[in-house]
Design a protein with these regions (language model features):
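Fungal secretory targeting signals
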Residues: 1-20
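Carbohydrate-active catalytic/glycan-binding domains of CAZyme proteins
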Residues: 18-347
Length: 347
C-alpha cells in the first residue's frame, strides 16, 4: 500500500479501580509494553464507541448513553459542550435491548439532513437492531426516530439471508464515489462484517426481500470470529475498511491471551463492495487485516471503536479516532476520555 499520513484521535477509558489487575511480571503477559507506537494526547470528554462528524466549522461527538447525547467543540481536544440528545424517550423499535440507551452511533450529513444510525442489543446476543433518526440541524432541535433499518434474531425480515446469520450492530455508512449509491455496513462476531445498499432516502434497505448484501470480512477457520465495529472511508483511489479485532472489554473476570484484545485493523479495495485485502494482499474474507494500532507502552490497552474523519482538503490528513483502556488507571470500561496522538505514516 502507498504511504498515507494519518492524524489519529483516540479515546481513553478512565477506570474506577476494579480487579483484576496484572502486577509485575504479569503485565507483559496481558498487554504489550512496546514503545514503537505513539501514546495519545488528552482530549477531555468521556466517550465509548465515539462517533464524530464535522459541520459548520465544529466537531460533533455522539456516544452511546441514555437517550444518545451529543457534544460540540471547535477543536478535537475540546472543550466539549453538551448540545442535546437524539432521543427524549425510548426508541420506537420494539422487543430489543437498550431501547433507552442506544449503542455505537454513526451520524452522517447527506443532502442537508443528518442521519444517526444507532444500535439496540444486549451484550453477547444476536437479538439486535440498527435504527435511524434524522434532524435538519445539530443545534439541539428535535430528532425524528424512523425505527429499524435491519433486525436480526427476531423482527421484520430477520429470517432473510444474511440477517438470519449476522448481528445487526455497529452501523457505518459509505457512498460510492462513482455511482453515488449509499451503503450500510454492519456486523459483529458470528459471521463478521457485511454491507448492503440503502434506499434513496437512507431510511431503509433498498430491497428488503433481496438485500444484495455482501460480506466484507470473515475469519473462516476459527470458532470465535471477533471482528466488529467497522468503518469505511475513501482515500483516492481506495475504499478502506477499518475494524476492531479481538475482545473489547469486560475484563473483570479475566483477560484474553496477549494480543487477543482489541486492535485496529484495515483492508482496502478499489471497489466499495470489495473484495478487500490487507497490506500483504491477504483477503479480509480469509481472516486478513493489517494491524494499524494495538496495545502499547504498558498504558494503551485494547484500542477500538474506530471512525475516520476525512481531511478538509487534499493537503490535510484524514483523522482516525477510537477508544482504548488506560491501564495506568485500570481495566474496566466504565468511563472514557478522548485523546489525540501525533501524526504517523501508515502503510
Amino acid at each position: 500500500m502507498p504511504r498515507i499520513l494519518w492524524l489519529l484521535a483516540t479515546f481513553v477509558v478512565l477506570i474506577q479501580a476494579a480487579p483484576p489487575f496484572p502486577f509485575g511480571d504479569e503485565v507483559s503477559q496481558v498487554y504489550e509494553t512496546t514503545d514503537t507506537l505513539p501514546l495519545p494526547n488528552l482530549g477531555n470528554i468521556v466517550a465509548h464507541d465515539p462517533n464524530i462528524v464535522q459541520s459548520n466549522g465544529f466537531y460533533y461527538l455522539f456516544k452511546g448513553d441514555p437517550h444518545l447525547p451529543f457534544f460540540k467543540a471547535a477543536n478535537m481536544s475540546g472543550p466539549w459542550e453538551l448540545v442535546g440528545h437524539v432521543f427524549d424517550k425510548a426508541s420506537i423499535i420494539q422487543h430489543k435491548g437498550a431501547r433507552k440507551r442506544p449503542w455505537a452511533p454513526t451520524t452522517i450529513e447527506h443532502n442537508g439532513m443528518f442521519y444517526c444510525y444507532y444500535t439496540l442489543s444486549t451484550h453477547g446476543s444476536r437479538d439486535s437492531a440498527i435504527g435511524v433518526a434524522t434532524t435538519t440541524t445539530l443545534d439541539g432541535s428535535a430528532w425524528t426516530d424512523h425505527g429499524a433499518v435491519i433486525e436480526t434474531d427476531g423482527g421484520k425480515d430477520s429470517d432473510v439471508y444474511p440477517f438470519n446469520i449476522t448481528n445487526a450492530i455497529d452501523a457505518s455508512f459509505i457512498t460510492d464515489q462513482a455511482t453515488e449509491e449509499s451503503y450500510l455496513n454492519w456486523g459483529s462476531f458470528w459471521h463478521d462484517i457485511w454491507q448492503l445498499p440503502l434506499s434513496a432516502d437512507l431510511l431503509s434497505m433498498k430491497n428488503p426481500i433481496d438485500p444484495d448484501a455482501v460480506q466484507l470480512s470473515f475469519i473462516p477457520h476459527k470458532k470465535s470470529k471477533p471482528e466488529e465495529g467497522s468503518w469505511m472511508s475513501y482515500h483516492d483511489p481506495y475504499y478502506y475498511v477499518w475494524f476492531s479485532h479481538g475482545k473489547c472489554c469486560r475484563f473483570q473476570k479475566g483477560f484474553p491471551g496477549r494480543g487477543e484484545e482489541y486492535s485496529i485493523r484495515v483492508g482496502r479495495s478499489r471497489n466499495v463492495r470489495g473484495p478487500f485485502v490487507d497490506k500483504n494482499n491477504n483477503l479480509l474474507l480469509d481472516g486478513g487485516g493489517t494491524v494499524v494500532y494495538a496495545s502499547n507502552n504498558g498504558k494503551v490497552y485494547a484500542p477500538g471503536g474506530v471512525g475516520v474523519l476525512p481531511g478538509i482538503n487534499a493537503s490535510t490528513s484524514d483523522i482516525l479516532y477510537f477508544h482504548y483502556l488506560n491501564t495506568s488507571i485500570g481495566f474496566t470500561d466504565q468511563v472514557c476520555m478522548p485523546k489525540t496522538w501525533d501524526r504517523m505514516n501508515g502503510n
